[in-house]
């Protein structure tokens, strides 16, 4: 079964074409990135395994034209991987926000589209772009089944006391202001993968997953269900991130608004685009640049990394308390998979939980491995995530029922 996976942003779209033999056996046929949609000149980077990348510069006025260009590439005589577009069996979309309307992935039809539209208010940067991708496929390939896989769905199992904010209840009833959480597709995938690696029963274990990259979140998974997560109403809550502040006293917002006469956009820019690693270090939003600057003696860069590691440790400890125990900690994402020093610092700071860290086993980047010693009460793993594969798996599951 050949599935096209799409992840549409406001001015870009990522794509993968996977040939799914079954849920666990698959091959990647092609992947790529369409950038600068709506600008004077766009760019498509198309990659086929074991071939040189193919780059095209051309105007791409909208998402429909972007997806049309991708489809043309997939059947191109020189760079294509399909004989005909009829070989594509289904399309899976990453959708940022499903609110409390979608607790699982859904086959896309008119009611699902209406539901995604209702959630645009909750994710104004992402959901409209996701919808553009869905509507573009509808116009180009009207007969093909489409599936929406929501970033928020996995966290819909959180109990009320975990997802509610202690603000007037009517804001929840009227405006759906509550904690939703994100990266759900990744958290579930790496938790299941790590449980299998460690020989644990995913549905009978207490697991903390740390998806750490330019955006980052930590999730408590108890017996296969998300029971708490660090991101909240928006992806700005939680750990320190590349340009996002993470947890912050709400009073700071009104203080900055009053003192500097900031409007809503101004405050949003501060919290989402000027904070985190970038705001503290003044160097970069990239953890690799921060660590390099810290090694050269830059105090602010070192402070940014220590704040980040401290927050992650706090969440692991808090979630162990929330679940009344801990069996496994999982690291994934760009930082989680590749930054040995972050994993070591976080884990040695949590040794009281029963983590017997293995420094030698930790010397790995981008591989799946247990990084605690045999007999450690709490198992720690580092594993690669693959959100596109999960989207393809969900698409296959829902379209072959």
Residue ranges and their predicted role:
Residues 269, 276-280, 287-322:
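Adenine-nucleotide phosphate-binding core of ATP-dependent small-molecule kinases
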Residues 73-88, 196-201, 316-327:
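Phosphate/pyrophosphate-binding loops at sites that engage ATP/ADP/AMP, CoA/4′-phosphopantetheine
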Residues 221-222, 227-263, 269, 333-364:
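Catalytic phosphate/nucleotide-handling subdomain of diverse soluble enzymes
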Residues 9, 93-97, 212, 330-338:
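Glycine-rich beta-strand-to-loop/alpha-helix junction loops that act as flexible
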Residues 74, 78-126, 147, 154-162:
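Short beta-strand-loop/turn "lid" adjacent to the catalytic site in phosphate-handling enzymes
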Residues 302, 306-327, 336-401:
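Internal helix-turn-beta structural module
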Residues 154-259:
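Glycine-rich phosphate-binding loop of actin/hexokinase-like ATP-binding domains
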Residues 1-99:
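N-terminal glycine/serine-rich phosphate-binding loop of ATP-dependent small-molecule kinases
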């Amino acid at each position: 079964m050949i599935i096209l996976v799409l992840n549409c942003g406001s001015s870009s779209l990522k794509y993968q074409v996977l040939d799914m033999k079954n849920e666990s056996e698959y091959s990647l046929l092609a992947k790529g990135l369409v950038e600068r949609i709506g600008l004077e000149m766009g760019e498509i980077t198309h990659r086929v395994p074991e071939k040189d990348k193919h780059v095209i510069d051309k105007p791409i006025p909208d998402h429909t034209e972007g997806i049309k260009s991708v489809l043309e590439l997939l059947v191109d005589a020189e760079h294509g991987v399909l004989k005909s577009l009829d070989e594509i069996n289904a399309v899976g979309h990453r959708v940022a926000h499903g609110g409390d309307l979608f607790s699982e992935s859904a086959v896309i039809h008119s009611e699902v589209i209406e539901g995604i539209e209702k959630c645009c208010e909750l994710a104004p940067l992402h959901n409209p772009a996701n919808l553009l991708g869905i509507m573009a496929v509808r116009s180009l390939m009207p007969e093909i089944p489409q599936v929406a896989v929501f970033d928020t769905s996995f966290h819909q199992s959180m109990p009320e006391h975990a997802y509610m904010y202690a603000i007037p209840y009517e804001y929840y009833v009227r405006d759906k202001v509550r904690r939703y959480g994100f990266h759900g597709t990744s958290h579930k995938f790496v938790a299941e993968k790590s449980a299998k690696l460690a020989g644990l029963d995913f549905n009978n274990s207490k697991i903390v997953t740390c998806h750490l990259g330019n955006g980052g979140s930590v999730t408590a998974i108890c017996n296969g269900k998300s029971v708490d997560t660090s991101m909240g109403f928006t992806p700005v809550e939680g750990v320190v991130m590349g340009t996002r502040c993470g947890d912050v006293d709400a009073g700071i917002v009104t203080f900055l608004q009053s003192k500097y006469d900031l409007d809503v956009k101004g405050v949003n820019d501060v919290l989402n685009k000027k904070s985190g690693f970038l705001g503290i270090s003044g160097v970069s939003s990239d953890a690799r640049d921060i660590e390099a600057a810290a090694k050269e003696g830059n105090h602010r860069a070192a402070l940014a990394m220590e704040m980040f590691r401290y927050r992650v440790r706090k969440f692991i400890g808090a979630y162990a308390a929330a679940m009344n125990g801990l069996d496994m900690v999982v690291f994934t994402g760009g930082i989680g998979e590749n930054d040995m020093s972050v994993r070591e610092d976080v884990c040695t700071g949590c040794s009281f939980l029963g983590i017997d860290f293995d420094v030698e086993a930790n010397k790995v980047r981008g591989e799946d491995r247990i990084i605690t010693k045999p007999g450690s009460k709490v198992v720690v793993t580092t594993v690669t995530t693959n959100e596109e594969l999960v989207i393809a798996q969900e698409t296959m599951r829902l379209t072959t029922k």
